[in-house]
């Protein structure tokens, strides 16, 4: 594997809307290093650890109530693909999964509190779902038309999704033939909240796209690799679907940040609330001990050679680490330290 210096790149991959609102964006592939990387001490024991990171609480709400995730399946999805994603969501709160587990990964999220000292919930469950198999808003979506898709899901005459502003998360998942504004070039997923002027309610939501046809080397890394890293070989995906296995880490990233910063006024670093650096942004591309730069860190392999770092209920997944504000470093349940 092509090796670059072990460090954390704090170039936050957030994207600005052309409309007045701005949305957090994320892409998992290894960023190109630059001079700012040198502020991090590669000899530190814990990945991404730095006294220079100032993740602060800005007094906004976090999700202390039990979380219900409502997937919206936009476009054509195979049953096998839906099952991979559903089982990941159900694994977040699962007890008894083999170590290292998805639920162990979520414990870092649970460290975060609101202004009363209440921790983020340990209960995340799969809620009602909505299928939009006929591409109701076309195959090319803007950031604002995404909100229109969510509006259609919660106002549908036939089995609308429940409206739950306090503990509901609305997860829009687009099929591999759908293009979303800035997809592949700048983001693989983002989260924000809906505007009452469009949807009728303020609802925390996230979008994640299947990159299998459009840009797997960008959004399904390390199951596919970007062209700017010559000689680097992809690893085998744990569930046999490069696009969906690549989505899992992006979904994990966005759910963790929705829980800790649902209205973009709670936990984040940086001076700008409309372009915050959040708990998953700080650990982008780190999946194991030693991770940073273009190196994912030490991961695990199953008997078939597939790569993963956490166990779910019945499946294995590869998901990025998260920032712990308690100890000021990126951490995950598969850490070797």
UniProtKB/Swiss-Prot annotation:
**Signal sequence coordinates:** 1-25
The family database entries (Pfam families) matched by this protein are listed as: Phi_1
Q: Which InterPro entries match?
A: EXORDIUM-like
Main localization, broad class: secreted
Role summary: May play a role in a brassinosteroid-dependent regulation of growth and development.
> What Gene Ontology cellular-component terms does the record carry?
apoplast; plant-type cell wall; plasmodesma
According to the record, glycans are attached at: 34, 66, 119
Which residue stretches, if any, does this entry annotate as coiled coil?
A: none
Write out the annotated subcellular location: Secreted; Secreted, Extracellular space; Secreted, Extracellular space, Apoplast
Q: What induces it?
A: By brassinolide.
Q: What gene is it encoded by?
A: EXL3
Q: What is this protein called?
A: Protein EXORDIUM-like 3
What UniProt keywords are attached to this protein's entry? Apoplast, Glycoprotein, Secreted, Signal
UniProt family annotation: Belongs to the EXORDIUM family.
Question: From what organism does this protein derive?
Answer: Arabidopsis thaliana (Mouse-ear cress)
């Amino acid at each position: 594997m092509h090796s670059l210096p072990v460090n954390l790149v704090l170039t936050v991959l957030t994207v600005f809307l052309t409309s007045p609102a701005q949305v957090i964006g994320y892409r998992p592939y290894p960023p190109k290093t630059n001079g700012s990387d040198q502020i991090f001490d590669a000899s530190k024991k814990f990945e991404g650890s730095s006294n220079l990171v100032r993740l602060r609480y800005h007094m906004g709400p976090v999700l202390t109530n039990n979380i219900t995730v409502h997937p919206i399946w936009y476009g054509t999805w195979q049953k096998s693909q839906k099952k991979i994603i559903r089982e990941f969501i159900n694994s977040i709160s699962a007890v008894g999964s083999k170590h290292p587990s998805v639920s162990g990964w979520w414990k870092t999220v649970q460290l975060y509190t609101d202004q009363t000292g209440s921790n983020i919930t340990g209960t995340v469950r799969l809620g009602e779902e909505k299928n939009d198999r006929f591409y109701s808003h076309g195959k090319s979506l803007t950031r604002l038309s995404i909100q229109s898709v969510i509006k259609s899901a919660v106002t549908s005459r036939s089995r609308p999704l429940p409206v739950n502003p306090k503990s509901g998360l609305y997860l829009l998942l687009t099929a591999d033939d759908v293009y979303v504004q800035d997809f592949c070039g700048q983001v693989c997923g983002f989260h924000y909240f809906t505007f009452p002027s469009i949807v009728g309610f303020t609802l925390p939501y996230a979008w994640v796209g299947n990159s299998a046809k459009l840009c797997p080397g960008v959004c399904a890394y390390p199951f596919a690799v970007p062209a700017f890293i010559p000689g680097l070989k992809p690893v085998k995906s744990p569930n046999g679907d490069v696009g969906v296995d690549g989505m899992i880490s992006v979904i994990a990233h966005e759910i963790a940040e929705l829980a800790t910063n649902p209205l973009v006024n709670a936990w984040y670093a940086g001076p700008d609330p409309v372009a915050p650096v959040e708990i998953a942004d700080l650990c982008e591309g780190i999946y194991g001990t030693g991770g940073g730069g273009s190196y994912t860190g030490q991961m695990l392999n199953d008997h078939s050679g597939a790569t993963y770092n956490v166990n779910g209920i019945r499946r294995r997944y590869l998901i990025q680490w998260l920032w712990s504000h308690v100890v000021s470093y990126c951490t995950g349940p598969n850490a070797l330290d």
